[in-house]
Amino acid sequence: MVTAGMLPRAAVREVEARLRAAGCPDADFDAAELFRLAVGGDARLADAPLGAEQAERLEALTARRAAREPLQYLCGSWPFLDFELAVGPGVLCPRADTEVVAEAAAGMLAGVEAPRVLDLCAGTGCLGLGVKRFCPAAQVTSLEKSPAAYRYLEQNAHLSPVLTITPVQGDLFTYWQTLPEGQLDLIVSNPPYLTAAEMGALQPEVAQEPAMALEAGEDGLVFYRAIAEHYQKALRPGGALALESCNGPACCQRVDGYRVQKRLWRQ
């Protein structure tokens, strides 16, 4: 237990041991982050014993992380590319895989002047903001259904005068009806794609993220089918669609009417 009077390095060792015992991956990194949140600064550079309030904060954070609450939720923000996103309970945590998708998707806009981009199932807005980061001229609209997730999308929508997107609350399964034909240059999405079986075998941290952002029916393809069927007409001739998926071949086989330009695999 973390108590007042503990030296910083001893406190971090205690936190790391408890997180490791709880099965948390990267317990050393997490312990250092929890110390930074509770006390401030780097424990390796601190010498003063912990005060009562500092120890209480660190103990509370340690208990939550040991219960496998995602570190991103405890931090309240998380880096994505070279910017920080607000994140917390009710929204999918930004992941490094999505950075790869954002860069590849932005590359599809080369030579397009003031491209119009739609980000479906936006969550924090990380994918749409990532495209905007790589293609500042892009006009990005980000759609999110969940009220809880939409609050974070709104917070992240105006990170700077340059890094700005338009948040919209709506449902992917009906929003297509509002779109004119042939007006979009790019559609991006990191939709739910886990099967019912995969939902029953989630890592504890992922299990605390919203099921609404993860589950996609028995075969994990419900959202891909909807995007392929309903959103193609919204793209201009030669427009592009960039989707994140963990079951790439199965997804590609079912996206009729599209030519697969590039597949990205991350080990």
List where the protein language model places each region.
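A short N-terminal interaction module
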Residues: V2-Q54, L58
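A general structural signal for well-ordered alpha-helical segments in protein cores
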Residues: V12, A31, L58-E59, L71, ...
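Generic alpha-helical structural context detector
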Residues: A32-R36, A63, E103, L129, ...
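Conserved AdoMet
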Residues: F35-G107
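Short glycine/threonine-rich catalytic loop with a Thr-x-Gly-x-Asp
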Residues: P94, G123, G220
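Conserved SAM/SAH cofactor-binding pocket of Class I
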Residues: E99-M199, A226, G248
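Mobile active-site "lid"/loop adjacent to the S-adenosyl-L-methionine
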Residues: Y193-F223
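Conserved Class I SAM-dependent methyltransferase catalytic core
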Residues: E218-Q267
